[in-house]
């Protein structure tokens, strides 16, 4: 199957600033946190859990619940959070007639995004070179792949970019095949004379003579 690049329509307002900060509290996509706590009051518990990527064992003089543990873990947590957010936060929705993926890509300009389909998979790629922000210099790059539902025509996949920096990729689902109504075929009966045809009738008459 050939690769197809999906063009996306720009829905951004003229005042859009591609390098604006990202505010998790204003995005409903942040509810799918990929392991990142949604609410600030959960962070202190998350810091003390050895399973999270930025866990650092506290010093002997500080307890796990003390402020020293949070202070010690904060830099590592910030790095882990940045890794999570730089790859984008996405959600998948499927209704009876449509499949849709929404991905937060507000860190990227439209020309830095690529959407394409190949062998039943949608691939979204974003990349920007190193540039300066309020914290220093940063470069970002991500690739996300989503498997299309069975039967979806890849040529019907479309995408759009909202003013809030949300990339939406969607495709119509194939309609279910409806079974035809049941039809009863009547059986017709033929007489013996009709089965043999006219010649059979003549032979029977000559035999009687």
From Swiss-Prot:
GO biological process: anterograde axonal protein transport; cellular response to vascular endothelial growth factor stimulus; chaperone-mediated protein folding; intracellular signal transduction; negative regulation of apoptotic signaling pathway; negative regulation of oxidative stress-induced intrinsic apoptotic signaling pathway; negative regulation of protein kinase C signaling; positive regulation of angiogenesis
Modified residues (Phosphoserine): 13, 15, 27, 86-87, 90, 102, 180, 203
Modified residues (Omega-N-methylarginine): 12
Modified residue annotations for Phosphothreonine: 178
Region (Interaction with TGFB1I1): 74-209
Residue ranges of domain sHSP in the record: 80-188
Matches recorded under PROSITE patterns: SHSP (PS01031)
Localization annotation: Cytoplasm; Nucleus; Cytoplasm, Cytoskeleton, Spindle
Reported consequences of knocking out the gene: Mice are viable and fertile with no apparent morphological abnormalities in tissues under physiological conditions.
Chief location of this protein within or outside the cell: cytoplasm
Modified residues annotated as N6-acetyllysine in this record: 127
Keywords, comma-separated and alphabetical: Acetylation, Chaperone, Cytoplasm, Cytoskeleton, Methylation, Nucleus, Phosphoprotein, Stress response
SUPFAM superfamilies, alphabetized: HSP20-like chaperones (SSF49764)
InterPro entries xrefs: A-crystallin/Hsp20_dom (IPR002068), ACD_HspB1 (IPR037876), Alpha-crystallin/sHSP_animal (IPR001436), HSP20-like_chaperone (IPR008978)
PANTHER family in alphabetical order: HEAT SHOCK PROTEIN BETA-1, HEAT SHOCK PROTEIN HSP-12.2-RELATED
Family statement: Belongs to the small heat shock protein (HSP20) family.
Protein name per its UniProtKB record: Heat shock protein beta-1
Species, as recorded: Mus musculus (Mouse)
